[in-house]
Regions:
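Short, solvent-exposed helix-helix connector turns and helix-capping sites enriched
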Residues: 31-34, 282, 387, 521
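Basic- and hydrophobic-enriched, low-structure N-terminal and domain-boundary segments
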Residues: 1-159, 163-168, 397-401, 560-565, ...
Length: 607
């Protein structure tokens, strides 16, 4: 019988009576001889049914084992050892074991007896869960291919989600992969550990940091990667408010954003958030910009007929010039003349069809009053992303980085969004970044270019950044060697952000590997249990019957039975009682691991 299953043999009442009867004898022995006292004490324990070695072993198992401590400087050597391990395991998850059916049956017995908390040890959870296979734990080495199919991490606040993310991120840095970390919280410890690991691996120069509060940040342009203007317009339109009066104008707002980007392309100006805001603020920019571009184009052609045609159009404009108060009414005829000029140039093969010019002319032809309604929701959006220090970080005049640069050069990128301080700005910027990543993945996929180094994308508090682009990355980015790891507290967070249970299940359905730390939320624990394998557990039952018969007298009977029933390999009730830093992990092949995370210390801390 295992020590963790040892029960006192004698009934509690009998043990108590026997102990009371032995007290006078112990007192008499203590008064005459110490040897007799010790002998009597041992006999008393044996008679009371207390098996001392198992009892001591049981008490020792109730104490949570100390967590392993790693320093950032040790990760390069750890990664090398993991890569050389038998079986090709190259991701270290701490100490643990493969959870099997026998563990599930033992856990069911603990659940039937009732689990006791271990809060006195400061780790939360319950001691029985920790005691299972405590002395048979081995280093957990997860095959790297298991993380390629995307991963999801569930765990309530303070259970170790960030510790697990930190361990996965720092090992990816040590393996030399491209690493992108989007941190809505702005955890300074996480940023410090990434920097220390990068330096320890000789990759200190590869690290780029973007902090929306401007703390030691490098300029970054989340709009620099695109194939056409409509792509940028669609990205920004996804950030617009949903529902209400703005919903009816959303398609027109996207047209205005696209036309603004088209005008910047025609003028050769950088496409940044600030430049788009500058264009979209004034409807007149579209007409004046298109006219200036056509004049410059005709000047480059050095064609006398084209110059004469432009002069005649300008002459007609002068003859039919409207009063100052009728500027809005004269906009349509002015755009019509520009369209006429474009048609004449195309007819004489002096100008090729230009989609960007058509976008600008279409927006210039829009009624001014209607344009104000269309752009009413876009202006506040762009304004928040161009405010204060964000203007220099995201739209600065100097050189800036982009995700195309990060992926192409195999660098390390960390961004702190500080959603706790400004949730609106942080969430919008995070969604813009996910849209840029989806665009990069789409271009690589279309070109058939798979990055040599895997692109690891880690998103903490993923529910803050849920969007259509995140779903697209999960659905399709694996084909270009992208691997996403998402972390969140509860399943309800995903349901709320996606607008329904189906949307949340769509995200989880794309994650092959599932990590779960302690889940205080019952619905989350049940959801994790639903995605785990099942096994057969025995249920014992007993019955005592008494029957009084006039002829046969009193009859009695005792029956015991054991039947098997299907039960989860790790039940939701136990998942809600896991100690801190302990986790279960369901792999893509169906195996279930249970482990204890190590603590990743900094260079300034002692291990």
């Amino acid at each position: 019988m295992a020590a963790s299953d040892m029960m006192f043999r004698a009934p509690a009442a009998a043990r108590h009576l026997l102990a009371l009867a032995l007290i006078p004898g112990l007192l008499w022995c203590s008064a005459h001889d110490l040897v007799l006292l010790l002998a009597a004490a041992v006999m008393s324990l044996m008679l009371c049914g207390v098996h001392l070695p198992p009892l001591l072993e049981r008490r020792r198992e109730r104490r949570p084992a100390a967590c392993e401590r790693l320093r950032a400087a040790q990760l390069p050597q750890l990664t090398e050892r993991c890569a050389a391990a038998p079986g090709g395991g190259d991701v270290y998850l701490g100490q643990g074991f493969v959870w099997q059916a026998r563990h599930a049956r033992l856990l069911q017995e603990h659940l039937q007896r009732g689990l006791r908390p271990a809060s006195a040890h400061g780790r939360g959870g319950c001691c029985e869960l920790h005691a299972i296979e405590q002395h048979n734990r081995r280093p957990l080495l997860l095959p790297q291919c298991s993380l390629t199919g995307h991963s999801m991490i569930f765990g309530t606040t303070g259970t170790g989600k960030t510790t697990l993310l930190m361990l996965l991120i720092c090992q990816a840095v040590a393996r030399g992969e491209t690493v992108i970390v989007i941190d809505p919280k702005g955890d300074r410890t996480l940023r410090t550990r990434i920097a220390q690991t990068a330096r320890a691996c000789g990759r200190g120069g590869d690290l780029l940091c973007l902090d929306v509060l401007g703390h030691d940040s490098a300029p970054f342009n989340p709009l620099s990667s695109f194939t056409d203007a409509s792509e940028v317009g669609a990205r920004l339109a996804q950030l617009l408010p949903q529902g209400g009066s703005a919903q009816s104008f959303r398609s027109y707002t996207e047209m205005a954003l696209t036309a603004s980007v088209s005008l910047l392309i025609l003028q050769g100006r950088p496409v940044t958030l600030q430049q788009i805001l500058e264009v979209i603020q004034d409807h007149r920019h579209f007409h004046s910009g298109a006219l200036a571009w056509l004049k410059a184009r005709i000047a480059q052609l050095d064609s006398a007929p084209a110059r004469d045609y432009l002069s005649r159009l300008q002459g007609r404009k002068a003859e039919g010039a409207a009063p100052a108060g009728a500027a809005a009414r004269s906009a349509l005829p002015a755009v019509a003349r520009l369209r006429e000029l474009c048609g004449w140039l195309e007819k004489h093969e002096l100008l090729e069809r230009n989609p960007d010019l058509e976008n600008v002319l279409a927006m210039a032809a829009m009624d001014g009053a209607f344009y104000q309604k269309v752009t009413a929701s876009a202006l506040p959006l762009l304004g928040t992303l161009c405010s204060s220090h964000l203007l220099q970080l995201l739209s600065g005049p100097g050189p800036s980085s982009s995700f195309a640069d990060v992926i192409g050069q195999g660098r390390i990128f960390y961004t702190a969004l500080h959603c706790l301080q400004n949730p609106g700005v942080g969430a919008r910027l995070g969604r813009v970044m996910l849209a840029d990543l989806a665009s990069c993945a789409g271009r690589l996929y279309a070109a058939g270019q798979v990055p040599r180094a895997r692109v690891d994308i880690f998103i903490d508090e993923a529910s803050e950044l849920v969007s259509e682009n995140l779903v697209q990355l999960l659905n399709k980015a694996r084909g270009v060697n992208f691997a996403l790891t998402l972390a969140t507290q509860t399943f309800a967070d995903l349901v709320q952000r996606t607008g329904g249970r189906d949307g949340a299940l769509q995200i989880l359905g794309n994650c092959n590997t599932l990590f779960a730390l302690r889940c205080a939320d019952e619905a989350t624990a049940e959801h994790v249990e639903h995605h785990l394998p099942t096994t057969a557990c025995g249920r014992r039952s007993s019955a005592i019957t008494l029957h009084d018969d006039e002829e046969l007298g009193l009859r009695e009977g005792i029956s015991r039975s054991l039947h098997l029933e299907e039960c989860p390999l790790f039940p939701a009730a136990a998942l809600r009682l896991l100690p801190n830093l302990e986790f279960i992990c369901r792999l893509a092949d169906g195996r279930l691991l249970k482990g204890l995370l190590p603590l990743l210390l900094g260079d300034e801390e002692e291990s």
